[in-house]
C-alpha cells in the first residue's frame, strides 16, 4: 500500500470542467474495484460533485492506508452531491464475462444516482459504460480527477466492507484482509475447501486445483450467457 505523498498534485476539476464546457450539465466520476479478485462482486461507484473544494488529502484509494481511506470515505460521503454503487455478482461475471459485467455494474450505479448525469469520466483507457452517456476515458483519473478520486475511495471502502461480511460467513479464505484477491491464505483455503458460492467459477485458478477443477465453467461466446462445465 502506497501512502499519499505531498509531492503528488491533488486531483482537479479540469476534466469535469471540459465536459461541462462541451455541454454536459451533470458529470459523474466512475471507478471500479474487484476486477481481478477470485471472489466477490465487481463493484462500480458513481460520484457527482458540486464543484466545491474536496476534502483535504483526497486521492486514489490505493494511495491511502486502510485507516485513512475509511476516514476519507466518511468525509467524501458528506461532501459529494450524490453517489451510488452498482455491482455484478460472481455468477453474472461467469455468465457475461468481465467487460459486460462491468457495464452492468456501471449502469446500475448510474441509474441509482439521485441526479442523472449527462457525461461520465471513467478511469483507464477502456469505455465499459457505453450509451446512453457521453463517456470520457482518462488514464489515472482516480488520481487526477476529483469525482473519480471520490468514487475510488467510496468503492474500495464499500467493497471491503462487503468482503468482511463474507469473511464472517466463510472464514479461512482471508476475505476480510484480502478482499477476495489471490493470496497464499486464499489459495490454501481453496485447495482444502474448494470455492464458495461467492467465487468466480469461470476463472483459470480452478485449473490449478485438481480436486475442484470439475467445478470450473466456461462461457460459450456463440450462445450469449450459456455456461457449461469444463470437460
Curated annotation (Swiss-Prot):
Domain named RNase H type-2 is located at 25-223
Q: Which residues bind a divalent metal cation?
A: 31-32, 123
- UniProt keyword Kinase present: no
Cellular compartments per GO CC? cytoplasm; ribonuclease H2 complex
Q: Where is the signal peptide?
A: none
- Report the main location listed first in the record: cytoplasm
Q: Enumerate the Gene Ontology biological process terms.
A: DNA replication, removal of RNA primer; mismatch repair
Please tell me whether the keyword Zinc is annotated for this protein.
no
One Pfam family matching this protein: RNase_HII
| Names of the cofactor(s) | Mn(2+); Mg(2+)
| Example GO molecular function | RNA binding
Which keywords fit this entry according to its UniProt record? Cytoplasm, Endonuclease, Hydrolase, Manganese, Metal-binding, Nuclease
* Protein task: Endonuclease that specifically degrades the RNA of RNA-DNA hybrids.
Return the similarity comment.
Belongs to the RNase HII family.
Q: What is this protein called?
A: Ribonuclease HII
